[in-house]
Amino acid sequence: MHFVAVYILTHFHAYPGVAALPFFSTLPKITSCCDHYVVLNSLSSVSSSTPTCLDGEXLFQNAGQKFCRPFTDNRTIVYTMQDQVQRPWSVTWMDFNLVISDYGRAVIENLTESAMSAHKNGPRYLQMETFISDLFRYECHRDNRYVLEKKLQMFYPTTHMNELLFYPSDPTLPSPYGNGHY
């Protein structure tokens, strides 16, 4: 089944209302289960915690590899991107923690029709199962956390000539894929 990567990025903090984050921003916190939980937060720090998935939190298993549902908290990181070249409009994206949840999938499905009908050059489709599998597979290479950021760049293109929403937290680092391969 294909889903649309449509994304509103709102940022809920102690203040009321929604604030748009800058276009060049760091990645939101992502937690997954490899040999143990791996956390990539907005400070680009990696840490580990419990060695196994929490009960009921396993998404699926593949060749002995267990994939856990990422932890979520009461903060939702949202980004709003405007196309300043043509007519301005917001590209709606799902926060990763919501994307792989049942709730997130339902939201994406509901957004698909409205997004595609509102913009003739609507957002791209992606296969969520492949997205999740590849994302976790690359995230498990914990010795280079920037691979995850590059992976998000590949799977979260905007509708404007593959312009990327997410940028590496340290753009001076070489690409883990080498020679500009995304």
From Swiss-Prot:
Keyword Transcription regulation among UniProt keywords: no
Record's protein name: Glycoprotein Q2
Record organism: Human herpesvirus 6B (strain Z29) (HHV-6 variant B)
Glycosylation sites: 74, 110
Signal sequence range: 1-20
Function in brief: Plays a role in virus entry by participating in host receptor binding at the cell surface.
GO cellular component: host cell endoplasmic reticulum-Golgi intermediate compartment; membrane; virion membrane
Compartment list: Virion membrane; Host endoplasmic reticulum-Golgi intermediate compartment
Subunit field text: Interacts with isoform gQ2. The heterodimer gQ1-gQ2 associates with the glycoprotein complex gH-gL to form a tetrameric complex. The gH/gL/gQ1/gQ2 complex binds to host TNFRSF4.
Modification after translation, per record: Glycosylated by host.
Keywords assigned: Glycoprotein, Late protein, Membrane, Signal, Virion
